[in-house]
Structure formats: C-alpha cells, structure tokens
Amino acid sequence: MTDAHHADDVRYQPLSEIDPEVAQAIAGELSRQRDTLEMIASENFVPRSVLQAQGSVLTNKYAEGYPGRRYYGGCEQVDIIEDLARDRAKALFDAEFANVQPHSGAQANAAVLMTLADPGDKIMGLSLAHGGHLTHGMKLNFSGKLYEVAAYGVDPDTMLVDMDQVREQAIKEQPKVIIAGWSAYPRHLDFAAFREIADEVGATLWVDMAHFAGLVAAGLHPSPVPYADVVSSTVHKTLGGPRSGIILAKQDYAKKLNSSVFPGQQGGPLMHAIAAKATALKIAGTDQFAERQARTIEGARILAERLTASDAKAAGIDVLTGGTDVHLVLADLRNSEMDGQQAEDLLHEVGITVNRNAVPFDPRPPMVTSGLRIGTPALATRGFDATAFTEVADIIGTALAQGKSADLESLQARVTKLAEQYPLYEGLEDWTIV
C-alpha cells in the first residue's frame, strides 16, 4: 500500500487527525500534569517504558486462561510476559504465589473475598469512616452487600488502630476474614498482632497493601507477606505502575485464587496492562526506585511538620496522629473555618491537586468532609528533594492557614516555579501517537 493510500486509511491516521477532540483532551491533561503539582496520595506518574508497554500491540491479544493453559491460540509471547510479571511480583515481595491478571485493585479484592469467604460470611476490616476502603465492607459496595460486615475503628484520642480493640471485636464477632489495610491512615499496622488475632479466632488474614506496596518493595515499610494468608495491591500508587491489581498469597491458596480471578471475576486479561505491570515490577526492584520511596516518606514528614506549625495551629489545622510513617498526611480541619471541600478548592486555585477526605468521627457530610488527604509519591517521582518538599509544604501550610486572605497569585507563582524546576515527561510528544 502506498503512502498516498495510507493518508486516507483510518488505520494509519494519527489520533490528532482521526479524533482531534480526544487528542486535545489528552494534550490538555498532559499540560495539567506538567504545570501543576499532583498530591493526591493514590496517584503517581508512570515511566516512559510503562507507557510504551501499555500502549503496545498487546492490546490486540485475547488470552483467557493462564500461561500454558489458554483458551486461545497464539499466546506464546503473552505467556512469556505474564510469567515475567508473576515471577517479578513473587521475587519483589518474597511471596509464594502471584496472580497479575486483576484489572484493578477492586477486582483483586473481589477475587480475594470470593476465595476466602462465601456470601453471608462475616468479614472485619477498618471502617471506611476511619480510613478503610470501599471494598473492605462499605455497605453500598459489593463487599458490604454480599458479606456480613463487622468493622473496627481507631481510638478517638490517638486516632490509631488499637489492637486490643481489634482483638475484642474479633472475639465478639468471630469473622471468617480479617482485613488489615487502608486508604487513609498515616501509620504502620501491626501485622504480627493481626496474625495472632486471626489465629485466635480461626479467621484468615488478608492484607490490602494498595497504598504502601512501593514502600514495602523498597524495604521502608514492614512487609505483610510473612504474616498474611493473602495480600492484594494496586500497582499504580506508590508502586508507580499501570492502573491495575495483583494478588500475592501462600501457595495453599493458589488454585482457588486463580479460579476466583478467572473465570470467577474476569474473562480475558488485559495483556498490555500485564506487560506494563511486568515492567513496573522490574523497576521497583532497582536502587533508584528505593531512593525515590525514601524521598516519598521524607516529603510526607516535611509536610506533616509544616502543618503542625504555629500558624496552622492558630487556624485550627491539625495533623491526624501527629505525623506520618508513610506517603501521605491527613490534615484534620474539624476545628478550622474551612471544610475539606473548601480546602481542596483553595489548593486547586494555586495549582496543587489534593482530595478532601473524611477524618474519623467527622461531623461533616461525606461530600464535604473535615479533612484533606495529601500525598507525596507523584512529586517524588518527579524528582522532588527535601528542599523542594519544604517549599511545597510551606505553600500548602500558608494557603490553609491564611485561607481566603492568602495571596493566591504569589502562591501560584511559587507552584509554577517548582513545576518548571522539575519538568515532567520531557519529549513526550515525540514518543507517543498523540
């Protein structure tokens, strides 16, 4: 076929020509990511190699089943890729078994519950209102509809998970599954204590490490793998990979977990996403990755310290638990004139993206909230060091402390300067099809 024919063939036209509306929106999103500071704790920036793997011809391939046992022909190359992803996941986390097919963290969690419990069985996880996740028993989620739920919470004085209270709740409720994990909790969990409690009441222990998996991979957070029967995770938060899920487990659960993922929860796996997972997991084993995770935690601690400064305290701002061990900080605005929505909007005006978040015992509605969840993974990926994190922490602290009286133009100029000092995706236009 000649070049002239290619020019009129929709198979060969670039996105900018075939669908300028979508291309323009993608370009706009690229500009947003470059020009603002991303501080949503569950977001990150994937490397060029991960973008390339996910945007590859693997998107064309159906591969129901598992390597060596597919229901389609032509799976020789995708078998290699899935085996690489599984082996890398097991090696990275020192796990006996890995399933890398879940399309998302929620899909992984659904498969875990299908494996460990029957509909109507009782599960026990951290309350959503106290920092848990939708899939740990929220009543509108499948986990709250299919299973009986007995949640545990945090201590009202310390805002920490009290293991004595967890034990009392477990003895009282006798759950089939105990869940350790969170989406908004700034401290380490005691996995050994959870294991002891699970053994005492005859429950299986499932740890959801979606948020802190990257810290575990870097050796900067206690690993749940030696203690849990099953561990699930996303790949796109601190791990910095594609939006997807993985499951790790003791070998005893392998067959049932595989069956719960396929055909239990999903049909064909997304092989382009699995390739991107494999690449992200390889990167997660490098010294560069570990150094980035160290900066992630350092940045969060710098932010927590700034939000406990005198001007923040005078404005009624507090930091949940007084600090952080991980990649996020929870700003407590219950005593502030601003609610979570107003604080989120204020930071958005100066070019910092965060998300409002309920705090334990929150008096405000869920769509308003009395808190902010602020994370550092994306900025650490961007290259931020202690000096840069100190600057962005001061921008946030000043904005929240001064509220409506803050000089937003000046704060926005400081954000722009940081974004320019730490450029993102340089040359991206040259190596994508946009």
UniProtKB/Swiss-Prot annotation:
The modification N6-(pyridoxal phosphate)lysine is found at residue 237. The record marks 236 as: Plays an important role in substrate specificity. One of its GO terms (biological process) is tetrahydrofolate interconversion. It is an enzyme of class 2 (transferase). GO terms for molecular function: glycine hydroxymethyltransferase activity; pyridoxal phosphate binding. The keyword Cell division does not apply. Keywords: Amino-acid biosynthesis, Cytoplasm, One-carbon metabolism, Pyridoxal phosphate, Transferase. Pathway: One-carbon metabolism; tetrahydrofolate interconversion; Amino-acid biosynthesis; glycine biosynthesis; glycine from L-serine: step 1/1. Its cofactor is pyridoxal 5'-phosphate. Its EC number is 2.1.2.1. It is found in: Cytoplasm. Its main location: cytoplasm. (6S)-5,6,7,8-tetrahydrofolate binds at residues 128, 132-134. The keyword Transferase applies. One of its GO terms (cellular component) is cytosol. It comes from the Bacteria. InterPro entries: PyrdxlP-dep_Trfase, PyrdxlP-dep_Trfase_major, PyrdxlP-dep_Trfase_small, Ser_HO-MeTrfase, Ser_HO-MeTrfase-like, Ser_HO-MeTrfase_PLP_BS, SHMT-like_dom. Belongs to the SHMT family. PANTHER family: SERINE HYDROXYMETHYLTRANSFERASE, SERINE HYDROXYMETHYLTRANSFERASE 1. Catalyzes the reversible interconversion of serine and glycine with tetrahydrofolate (THF) serving as the one-carbon carrier. This reaction serves as the major source of one-carbon groups required for the biosynthesis of purines, thymidylate, methionine, and other important biomolecules. Also exhibits THF-independent aldolase activity toward beta-hydroxyamino acids, producing glycine and aldehydes, via a retro-aldol mechanism. NCBIfam families: PRK00011.1 (NF000586). Homodimer. This is Serine hydroxymethyltransferase. The gene is glyA.
